[in-house]
Amino acid sequence: MTPADLAQLLKATAAAVLAEHGLDSAALPDTVTVERPRNPEHGDYATNLALQLGKKVGANPRELAGWLAEALAASDGIAAADVAGPGFVNLRIEASAQNVMVSNVLSAGADYGHSAVLAGKKVNLEFVSANPTGPIHIGGTRWAAVGDALGRLLTTQGAAVTREYYFNDHGAQIDRFSNSLIAAAKGEPAPEDGYAGTYIADIASQVVAKEPGVLDQPDDRMRETFRAIGVNLMFDHIKESLHEFGTDFDVYTHEDSMHTSGRVEQAIDKLRETGFAYEKDGAVWLRTTDFGDDKDRVVIKSDGKPAYIAGDLAYFLDKRKRGFDLCIYMLGADHHGYIARLKASAAALGDDPDTVEVLIGQMVNLVRDGQPVRMSKRAGTVITLDDLVEAIGVDAARYSLIRSSVDTPIDIDLELWSSASNENPVYYVQYAHARLSALARNAAELGIAPDTAHLDLLTHDKEGVLIRNIGEFPRILATAAELREPHRVSRYLEDLAGDYHRFYDACRVLPQGDEAPGDLHAARLALCAATRQVIANGLDILGVSAPERM
């Protein structure tokens, strides 16, 4: 009996109980859930359904809980049902009923935990989208990890996800980048508002190598040469860094294309059609205050040049024309004001604001020896993706960035995350997988194979805890996808790894000495194989390796 099976049983039982006592069964929620109690002594699962229904149906919640408990206790697979507190029902599942979860995992394999709840949903997931003026900084690195994990997570629920990088190659920052390259190529100091760091000198040298006479060109042509070649070289480095980090994109959209293809003008025309654009002081404005923004925004400035939001409008319209049902934007902490702006843009273009979701990520700080690490040797300013990977490796970097909710600032202790200790969360989870892999190899050498024929022998408390936890995996994925919170997967894996280590310490899996292999050994091996599969599935969603040996 899986948690989903138990929830269905609970809903059906509640409907029958309400009908029996002349109460309105229409008060039942569409979705009924069960939870694992924090204290295992309270039971295997618990529900507060009686508390939810009491006031709605005019019944005392504790009395209603008693009726529910009595009916559930008589159901197949339920060992006990007890009322607790003001109206909770604690449930214990018969071992024979819960052990089916082991077989479910082994049958589904790499697909265990997946669902079709988002089937038919076409999602555009835009993240990182760093300017091509320097290496990806640590904040963008957080999105590279979290965004990729979220894309994998949504895919497990059936969504068709397109990972997109919006390439900001239009505007003043590109001019400053070009001027910085020219200064470096001439051996001059960086402009006051320019970019510094060894990467600028490296790219400038590469531009000169590709175009030997570039410094002799007229200023406008020279600036354009450094801009075009320099931006491409920088973006090649960004894509290479992301690929080595395990993050790849399906689509790269150039901001400049929004302006050169006429799509900005098309978006402005659309705004005028819907009545949300107006002219004032020689500029074109968007009525974003109608949708919660603190002030209306200029779309076309009085000098005729498009404001930054003009590209955003054209870009959103472009996404919707490509057929996306949902557009998720992952932005940095300094972009909080964009939430209302993007939703207003959608509404102003005649769309539903709910087709836009904006996730805001908070700051990331690195710590070494108790002191903050602030400077990058290559970038000359902020810490970069490459710096983090060099310090702790790809797996630890991804896991450390995904592990916390994105709306929480995080400190990454470089010593902790590079250590081979149980205090290192990614090591703790990966070690559980490696330990399970070693166990499988040892069993194979002894000629013992996992067998689900005798799962009824798995009656130890630690076995039950482990079985129930692997049964939680589908719900964890569904919740994490719905809330856009991949950190829930990493926290779950740490909990599961802990349950496995405690099980292994309490329950001998393989025979020792002259002991003959038995059905219990084979059943425990099946449980271990299922646990290993779930850990591997979870790590895959995070983009973290599941090592066979450590």
From Swiss-Prot:
Gene3D superfamilies: Arginyl tRNA synthetase N-terminal domain (3.30.1360.70), HUPs (3.40.50.620), Isoleucyl-tRNA Synthetase, Domain 1 (1.10.730.10). Keywords: Aminoacyl-tRNA synthetase, ATP-binding, Cytoplasm, Ligase, Nucleotide-binding, Protein biosynthesis. It catalyses: tRNA(Arg) + L-arginine + ATP = L-arginyl-tRNA(Arg) + AMP + diphosphate. It is found in: Cytoplasm. InterPro entries: aa-tRNA-synth_I_CS (IPR001412), Arg-tRNA-ligase (IPR001278), Arg-tRNA-synth_N (IPR005148), Arg-tRNA-synth_N_sf (IPR036695), ArgRS_core (IPR035684), DALR_anticod-bd (IPR008909), Rossmann-like_a/b/a_fold (IPR014729), tRNAsynth_Ia_anticodon-bd (IPR009080). Its EC number is 6.1.1.19. One of its GO terms (cellular component) is cytoplasm. One of its GO terms (biological process) is arginyl-tRNA aminoacylation. It is an enzyme of class 6 (ligase). GO terms for molecular function: arginine-tRNA ligase activity; ATP binding. It holds the Pfam family DALR_1. The keyword Protein biosynthesis applies. It comes from the Bacteria. Its main location: cytoplasm. A motif ('HIGH' region) lies at residues 130-140. PANTHER family: ARGININE--TRNA LIGASE, CYTOPLASMIC, ARGINYL-TRNA SYNTHETASE. Monomer. Belongs to the class-I aminoacyl-tRNA synthetase family. This is Arginine--tRNA ligase. It comes from Mycolicibacterium gilvum (strain PYR-GCK) (Mycobacterium gilvum (strain PYR-GCK)). The gene is argS.
